[in-house]
Regions:
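Catalytic domains of carbohydrate-active enzymes that cleave complex glycans
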Residues: 219-377
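A generic structural motif
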Residues: 79, 127, 162-165, 195-201, ...
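Generic recognition of cysteine residues
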Residues: 3, 36-41, 166, 177, ...
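Gly/Pro-rich turn-and-neighbor structural signature
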Residues: 1-153, 163
């Protein structure tokens, strides 16, 4: 009753005529860890494919029905939404689908109606943290998560998705999420997802090194039109953002992808690789790789020399290249001080600090501020 009343109160704060886009409400909490393990909840869980979410769905339906009944009252006509949607977070312990696979007919089945949406418009908001976002959604290593989705999608339509694709503890490292998004956005479209939230660098936007500004652009384009070719989007981005420097910048991007693929293979990385801190830790890079990147950056800077006669254009192009330059610079600062001269190291540190400050870069990781690093340079 309390939850229903809070939703009803919110609807009165935002009348339909003034806020027509207010069409859904989220019932849930951020991270669903350590769910209840009492005897009664365990009994319900065991009945429904070992899914603890089976204890939550009936509660959600009760809340939704109360709100729907409230909206039908004549005095609440101004606040009524047609087909109002109630979402719940399917993440961690609550991601397991409460449906078993019936080998005899090749279909997912529910033990009873308590875990079905029935007449209520409730949908899961999936947070697929155990999908490997460096691989295609159709890759064999993503089979378990894909089957979990398929089980849910048998009974729930118009769902939402919270997706990932970076090193959350290292905002300066390159992460190859392009194999995933190339196929995933089409998959989500074909399965009637209505909202996708990509949690890339959630604490930093617009000045992301490691081509994460491009990653955000590509995701936005594919989520709007999943039939687009990712190679075309990459080329379009490079040509517009870097003009004559597109070729060396694209080579830098390819080198990043090759490093990521090699590191995954040699380190046997899985979906949990997002926890790694490559640029801030030893053993992930060879100095030859960094040196090669710096050489390509020198080519990129040389390509835009022609724009020095147009100071504003040159400044913008150089800054875009500078932001990507932060990636190898961070590797040197953290790992290879002894491999460069004292003067070169000081030059790298000074430029790194200036580019970060000029672009208001605030974080080294999702929860780590950059202040301490900049003060140490």
């Amino acid at each position: 009753t309390y939850c229903a009343e809070k939703i009803e109160q919110s609807l009165t704060f935002y009348p339909r005529e003034q806020f027509p886009l207010y069409a859904s409400v989220q019932l849930g909490m951020a991270d669903n860890y350590d769910m209840c393990s009492c005897d009664e909840c365990t009994k319900v869980k065991n009945k429904h494919n070992g899914a603890i979410v089976a204890t939550i769905i009936p509660f959600l339906k009760t809340v939704a029905r109360k709100v729907n009944e409230w909206m039908e009252l004549p005095e609440n006509a101004d606040y009524k939404r047609e087909n109002f949607q109630y979402t719940f977070f399917a993440y961690q312990d609550t991601l397991e689908a409460p449906f078993a696979y019936d080998e005899s007919n090749g279909k997912y089945v529910a033990a009873d109606n308590s875990v079905l949406p029935e007449e209520v418009n409730i949908v899961p908001y999936f947070a697929l943290n155990k999908i490997d976002h460096a691989l295609s959604i159709y890759d064999e290593k993503n089979t378990n998560m894909r089957e979990t989705l398929n089980a849910w999608l048998t009974f729930y339509k118009n769902t939402w998705g919270w997706i990932y694709g970076c090193f959350y503890q290292d905002y300066f490292a390159f992460y190859d999420c392009y194999n995933y998004y190339a196929d995933a956005c089409r998959y989500y479209y074909e399965h009637d997802f209505k909202l996708l939230n990509p949690q890339l660098h959630s604490s930093q936007r617009g000045a992301d090194t490691g081509f994460f500004t491009m990653a955000a652009y590509i995701f936005a384009k594919l989520s709007w039109n999943s039939s687009l070719e990712i190679t075309d989007l990459i080329n379009d981005y490079m040509n517009v953002m870097f003009k004559e420097a597109a070729e060396p910048m694209n080579k830098i991007f390819v080198e990043g992808r090759l490093w990521h693929a090699r590191s995954r293979y040699e380190g046997n990385w899985t979906w949990s690789a997002w926890q790694k801190t490559p640029t801030m830790s030893g053993g992930y890079f060879k100095f030859g790789y960094v040196n090669k990147l710096f050489g390509l950056f020198d080519e990129a800077y040389a390509k835009i020399e022609k724009y020095k006669g147009s100071p504003e254009v040159y400044k913008e192009l150089k800054n875009r290249i500078d932001i990507e330059w932060l990636y190898p610079a961070m590797i040197v600062i953290s790992n290879f001080q002894k491999e460069v001269s004292v003067d070169k190291y000081s030059e790298i540190c000074a430029k790194f600090k200036k580019v970060c400050q000029d672009n208001n870069i605030t974080h080294v990781s999702e929860r780590g501020l950059i202040n301490g690093l900049l003060q140490s340079l």
